[in-house]
Curated annotation (Swiss-Prot):
Residues 35-49, 67-82 have a biased composition (Basic and acidic residues). Residues 28-83, 116-263, 306-333, 398-421, 485-532 are annotated as: Disordered. InterPro entries: Cfap97/Hemingway (IPR038791), Hmw/CFAP97 (IPR029488). Keywords: Coiled coil, Phosphoprotein. It comes from the Eukaryota. This is Cilia- and flagella-associated protein 97. Residues 374-450 form a coiled coil. Residues 50-63, 227-239, 253-263, 493-503 have a biased composition (Polar residues). The modification Phosphothreonine is found at residue 133. Residues 170-185, 194-205, 320-329 have a biased composition (Low complexity). It holds the Pfam family Hmw_CFAP97. Residues 127-139 have a biased composition (Acidic residues). Belongs to the CFAP97 family.
Length: 532
């Protein structure tokens, strides 16, 4: 604090020198606030006027003007000019230590472009060299007068360059919303720097608030205002637009087609590709039609070409231009003829190949026997001819058999069926064949059977009555019955029409009373069973 106090005690009061600058700033701010309610078009034009007037004070050298123009392209033109003015004022009014702190705060708190701190220290060093001299008042007064006199000369050039840059920036902001949004971010940074540096000069607060209000517009408002200002430049009566009609026309032509399209660039690119593909497909479809149309054109124009050639031979020096056109047309027709002949040749070749594929094998077989050696020592010529005839006859028969579709289809079917059978099918076939063989054996046996003797009903009734007569007639009938019973069990068992009494007697006689088992006796030789 003691250091700052010592410096402030030896400091000269610059209120007299600052009063002129503050009065100029107040006049500018009053003019701005009086016309805030005007249209946005006029407001933007007035802002550009103020910018141009302030740049006249700023630019002291040609190098500095070029750097300022580059910075105006990167940022909107209203704000950096006022930043530079306020920084120069603060550099004159503050001591070295406070100035260095202020510059450090500005560079760290606000991310300003690199070109700003390179430009400010030059002005600061000039102020320091002239600040602590013997004639302080005269040096400061002369310096300000020198700055004003220098700024009066390049002001016109600066106005032109800034006007061009401003038009370019407005057109670029209207072309894409992304660039306008990035521009709005830089505007906010510049507005913050203005509000931070305005503590040293309180008279410039009102003008800076107005400028920051303009810069804090949304991207859409900027887009609209930029278009309106560029469109109304030719009709306005401001001296700047009147002095540069060519630039205003250029800006109108640049901005007029920048309305937002209905189709995105990717979709339009895809549509263009699709249209190109359609055109290619149509060209490919019309190739054959064009070829045949060219044939007709050649036929129709052949007479004209002949006449043109004759006329050319007669009037070569007189008709040079006509002959050149006829030559061009004849060359085109020759080229088309060549293409047509090539296509026709290809068609003929394809047809010939197809015919050879169909008829080639037969011709090949028939042509081979004709190619024979000139001399054959094993056979005479007559024998060789007979052999050739026989071979040709055999080849014809083989070719006929090969041409028949039935012969090819039947042979592989008979050969292919057995291996396709599965084991289950084979087992079924074997079982079926075995059953068929047994049935055939039984059928043969049944066919070989003959009717047995005495199996008729009349014969059995006669036997029954005869046996009954034997039993009733004599006492020795029991023996006879027993003997008859021994021979008659087979008959009684086989006849279903016999009576129950006879069957009971035959069964009793056949059963042994001691053992209870039937006694089997040898069969008579004349009796035969049906199943043997």
């Amino acid at each position: 604090m003691d250091q700052f106090g010592d410096i402030l005690e030896g400091e000269v009061d610059h209120s007299f020198f600052d009063s002129d600058f503050e009065e100029g700033k107040k006049c500018e701010t009053n003019s701005v606030f009086d016309k805030q309610n005007d249209d946005p078009k006029e407001r933007i034009d007035k802002d550009t006027k103020n910018v141009n007037s302030n740049t006249g004070m700023q630019t002291t050298e040609n190098y500095l003007t070029e750097k300022g123009n580059e910075r105006n392209v990167k940022f909107p033109p209203e704000h950096p000019v006022e930043n530079d003015v306020t920084q120069t004022v603060s550099s004159f009014s503050l001591p070295a230590s406070s100035r260095s702190k202020k510059l450090c705060d500005v560079t760290t708190g606000l991310k300003i472009h690199v070109s700003i701190p390179n430009r400010i220290p030059k002005i600061v060093k000039e102020g320091e060299d002239d600040y602590y001299t013997d004639g302080e008042e005269s040096s400061d007064d002369g310096k300000k007068y020198h700055v004003k006199s220098k700024s009066a000369k390049p002001s016109t050039n600066v106005k032109k360059s800034i006007r061009k840059k401003y038009c370019k920036v407005s057109s670029s902001s209207s072309s894409s919303l992304s660039s306008s949004s990035s521009g709005s971010g830089t505007d906010c940074l510049d507005a913050g720097s203005d509000s931070h540096l305005s503590d040293s000069s309180p008279s410039s607060k009102s003008s800076k608030k107005h400028v920051s209000g303009i810069t804090l517009l949304s991207p859409k408002h900027k887009y609209k205002s930029g278009i309106k200002s560029t469109e109304t430049q030719p009709s306005s009566t401001t001296p700047k637009c009147g002095h540069y009609p060519e630039e205003s026309e250029d800006t109108v032509t640049d901005v007029s087609p920048l309305s937002t399209p209905d189709i995105s660039p990717l979709q339009s690119f895809e549509l263009g590709i699709a249209n190109d593909q359609k055109v290619k497909i149509k060209k490919q479809e019309n190739v054959s039609q064009e070829i045949y149309e060219d044939v007709e054109d050649l036929k129709n124009n052949s007479k004209y070409l002949k006449a043109a050639k004759k006329g050319k031979e007669k009037h070569e020096p007189d008709v040079s231009s006509k002959s050149s056109s006829v030559l061009d047309s004849s060359l085109d027709h020759r080229h088309k003829q060549k293409v047509l002949h090539d296509t026709m040749d290809l068609n003929h070749l394809l047809k010939a190949f197809l015919q050879l594929d169909k008829k080639g094998p037969q011709k090949h077989h028939f042509d081979q026997p004709s190619v024979a050696p000139g001399k054959n020592y094993s056979f005479t010529r007559e024998e060789v001819r007979q052999i050739d005839r026989e071979n040709q006859r055999l080849l014809k028969e083989l070719s006929r058999q090969a041409e028949k579709p039935g012969s090819k289809s039947t042979i592989p079917r008979s050969a292919d069926h057995p291996p396709k059978l599965y084991h289950s099918a084979l087992n079924r076939q074997k079982e079926q064949q075995r059953i068929e063989r047994e049935n055939l054996a039984l059928l043969k046996r049944l066919e070989a059977v003959k009717p047995t003797v005495g199996m008729k009903r009349s014969e059995q009734l006669m036997d029954y009555h005869r046996n009954m007569g034997y039993l009733n007639s004599s006492p020795l009938s029991r023996r006879a019955r027993s003997t008859l019973g021994q021979y008659s069990p087979l008959r009684a068992s086989r006849t279903s029409s016999a009576t129950s009494g006879l069957s009971c007697r035959s069964e009793r006689s056949a059963v042994d009373p001691s053992s209870g088992h039937p006694r089997r006796r040898p069969k008579p030789p004349n009796v035969r069973t049906a199943w043997l």
